[in-house]
Structures are given as structure tokens and as C-alpha cells.
């Protein structure tokens, strides 16, 4: 089917989201996604209402016969927040074509898209090709932490510089850097690490976070935040010359024990598909995939 016949044969429209329709919009968004950190409609609605007006204006409703059947967020050359009401997924390609037309009218040529893999077929039909994907994993917390022969202590804000350099070393040459993850100059890294302490990725949980020390040297770290209703592994790293000795497992299990002591029943993390050593570690501690994969794809101009 050609793009022209697709666009002409399906009566869907794309309209800027009106605040009065925000509840219906986010209800539709949640209903069409399985890869979300939470299905709590109120959390998503509150996050939207807290955005500055220019960011609220990046949200568009997919409508049919005046009813919201889908959601999408548009950046200058980016599609995200895409979701369709489960009974209307056959309209996905037509909705995406409308979104692409808006972006191209604004001067976009190449377009990057972020979506759940249940929508990969309509994106692929319009020329998008997968670059990478990440998945959410969750595990029940438990108190039986593995023994560890290094000093553990909660990280403090004045350790931002040391943690920055540690994480930069951990991720140097990592497979994720090919996808633009964990890259950038030291100043950006420092801002990122400082932001974790300040709550940019959810409320920082110092009592569940640890750095592992050998003397004054950081050889491992786990940073936990409380993000969208559940504790999250914001960062986990082990020095390259200390890998394969159980330190990553010990850090995870220590954090899980602390969380269990706080009556937090589950812990979540995100991992890039293809990072097989990390996935194997997580599965060995009872982490399992929750929902679909979150895909990043690209349409070249």
C-alpha cells in the first residue's frame, strides 16, 4: 500500500493536545504500552502537567471521529511517546505518516523514533530501521546479600568528581557508546552524576546506594533512585580490572537487601539488548523482562 493510499484511506487526524483532554490522552497512552515503568495514569498525568508550556505543546493526539485513539510527542526531528488504543492499532501507520508530514513541514529530513517493539511493524513499513533497543527488568527484593571483601559505604555528593571519573572509565569502549549512550565530555558526565543526587532521575536513595572501595579507589558503585513508583538501578558499574569476581552481583544483592528492609518489594533496571553478560547476571539474580522492548529507530532523509 502506498503512503498516499494509506493516508487517504484512513480518517485519522493529528491535533495538538489540549489540557482539557489530558486525562483521555494519558489513559490512551497507558492502555497501548507494556514497556512503561508504571501504568499509574495519575503519575503520567502529573508529570505532563508539571512540564513547561513549550514541552506540553510537543504532545499531539491521534483522533478518529473526534475521539483520541493514539498519542505521540514530536521534537524537531524526533518521534516519541507513541501509543495506540489496543483496538485501533491498525491505524498506527496512518497516524505515523501524519506525524512525519508535520516534521518534514518543519524542515526535518532524517527522523529518530523511540517506540515499543509492538509498533515496530508500522514504523518499519514507513522506512524506519532499528538502531538499538533496551528492556526493563524487575526482580523481587531479598535480604540474603552475597559476602563481599571490599569496603562498602553510601556515596555522598562530594564524591561526584570521583564517581564521574569512575563511570567514564567503566563505560569507555562499552557497546552502548556506539548508540550514543554513556558518552560525552567530563563536564556533561559531572552534570549527569550530580543530577542523580539531586533527583533528576527520581529521588536518590542513599541508604540503598553504595560505592565499593579498595583503599581510596572506587572499584564499584550502585546508585539507586525511586523513579515513577519503584526503586531503579540508575547506575551500576565495576572497574574493568575487578570484573568477574562477583562484585556486581554483591552490589546488586546488597542494594536489594537494603530495599527489602525498607519494605520495597521490587527493584527495576534497564539494559540494552545485546549486552549479554549484564543480562545473564541480572537473570541469575531473578530479574526478568517486564513488557516489550523500547526501540530506537532511524529514518534516513
Predicted regions and their residues:
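Conserved beta-strand-loop-alpha-helix junction that forms the acyl-donor binding cleft
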Residues: 111-120, 240, 269-279, 296-301
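Acyl-donor-binding surface of acyltransferase catalytic domains
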Residues: 1-8, 76, 86-151, 155-156, ...
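Conserved acetyl-CoA-binding loop-helix of GNAT-fold acetyltransferases
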Residues: 89-102, 238, 244-261, 280-284
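A short beta-loop-alpha structural element at the N-terminal edge
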Residues: 9-27, 151-177
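A conserved beta-turn-beta hairpin within the catalytic core of GNAT-like acetyltransferases
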Residues: 68-83, 131-133, 204, 226-234, ...
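A conserved beta-strand-loop-helix scaffold within acyl/acetyltransferase catalytic domains
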Residues: 47-48, 74-77, 178-230, 236
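Helix-loop element at the rim of GNAT/NAT acetyltransferase active sites that forms part
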Residues: 27-42, 166-182, 200-201
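Conserved donor-binding loop and adjoining core beta-sheet/short helix segment
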Residues: 32-103, 214, 222-231
